[in-house]
Regions:
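Short glycine-/aliphatic-rich beta-strand segments at the starts of folded cytosolic domains
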Residues: 2-21
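Conserved helicase motor core of SF1/SF2 NTP-dependent helicases
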Residues: 110-122, 128-238, 242-318
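Proteins enriched for Cys/Gly/acidic motifs involved in redox and nucleic-acid/cofactor modification
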Residues: 87-118, 130
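Flexible glycine-/small-residue-rich
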Residues: 14-16, 44-46, 53, 169, ...
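A short, structured beta-strand/loop element
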Residues: 36-43
């Protein structure tokens, strides 16, 4: 005879009306998403969350509520990407590690949002930047490689542990030659550097970013501009590193100066180099894998924190 699972009823006390509102989401959107993931019924009555369903599912649902507590407890709505990341951690048996994510607040954005890693691998990446002078991050688009590195740089700058933030990337990533593009130098390189400015604007705001650039505290420049320099007291971020050649990667890495850190980011599935050139990032991942003082972090589609469809799109193109 098939055993019938027992049903049950769980209650969780909520600390405030703001927390209750955040946990519900607009039009109960969060509760509905929660129900679709866990298979239990959720209702908020006053300052209590009530859950009904079979016991095993109730236990998982309760665990999922607790994993997202650091967000909704502060009266903040739980983004779908955070809910999905928590659910994924629960499925992989990593709930204890995921519970620490909410405590890892790196900074606050200009709008007051808490900036923090959203997945376990993102947390490991942030901790690598904190503990190593050279960190490589390899993973698909949307996994927060550049954004989190920039947030870490902002935090170090605020704590006066560095004096400068340098963001760079190859200026030619689609086979175009700058000499044949219209406009002056700034107009030519701006489209390639725009993603870096976007990260800065989301952290510092437009006006403060421009002010820090004017003061020379933040520098955003093509990779070629790094040649011949020694970068001291800085956090230097190389973005789109998969599109560097071996010689460019070597040039960049040897710019590391005293009391500085470097972060090298890239997606080795999106290499735009031509003429069968070897990617400097791919080669570096082979020759530095066992080098003491250098850390490699690998992010996956499960770490994508853009629109939920992005994960599905990346998976579909594999």
């Amino acid at each position: 005879m098939k055993e019938v699972s027992k049903t049950g009823h769980f209650k969780i006390d909520l600390p405030s009306s703001d927390a209750a509102t955040a946990l519900s989401g607009p039009g109960n959107a969060f509760l509905k998403k929660f129900e679709s993931l866990t298979g239990v019924s959720l209702t908020i009555r006053g300052l209590q969350l009530e859950m009904n369903g079979v016991i095993p599912k109730l236990e998982r649902a309760s665990a999922l509520v607790e994993l997202t507590r650091p967000i909704w407890e502060q009266g903040l709505e739980v983004p779908e990407v955070d809910l999905n990341a928590a659910f994924s951690s629960l499925n992989m048996g990593e709930s204890s590690s995921h519970a620490e994510l909410g405590k890892k607040v790196l900074a606050r954005s200009k709008e007051g949002r808490f900036l923090r890693p959203r997945t376990i691998r993102q947390k490991e990446y942030v901790e690598s930047i904190e503990n190593f002078d050279l960190t490589f991050a390899i993973g698909p688009a949307g996994t927060g490689k550049t954004f989190l590195a920039t947030v870490c740089a902002a935090r170090l700058l605020n704590e006066k542990k560095i004096e400068k933030i340098v963001l760079t990337r190859p200026a030619v990533e689609a086979g175009e030659n700058l000499g044949f593009l219209p406009g002056d130098l700034q107009q030519k390189v701006d489209p390639y550097l725009r993603p870096l400015f976007d990260s800065l604007h989301s952290i510092f705001g437009f006006d403060k970013t421009n002010s820090l650039i004017d003061k020379g505290i933040i520098e955003v420049a093509p990779l070629a501009f790094m040649r011949g320099r020694t970068l001291d007291n800085s956090l230097v971020i190389l973005d789109e590193a998969q599109n560097t050649t071996t010689s460019q990667m070597r040039m960049f890495l040897t710019r590391l100066g005293e009391r500085s850190k470097m972060v090298v980011n890239g997606d080795i599935t999106q290499i735009d180099l031509k003429n069968e050139q070897i990617s400097g990032l791919v080669e570096a991942s082979k020759i530095f894998q066992q080098t003491k003082g250098i850390k490699f972090c690998y992010l996956t589609v499960e770490d994508v924190v853009r629109h939920p469809l992005v994960q599905k799109i990346i998976e579909a193109y594999k």
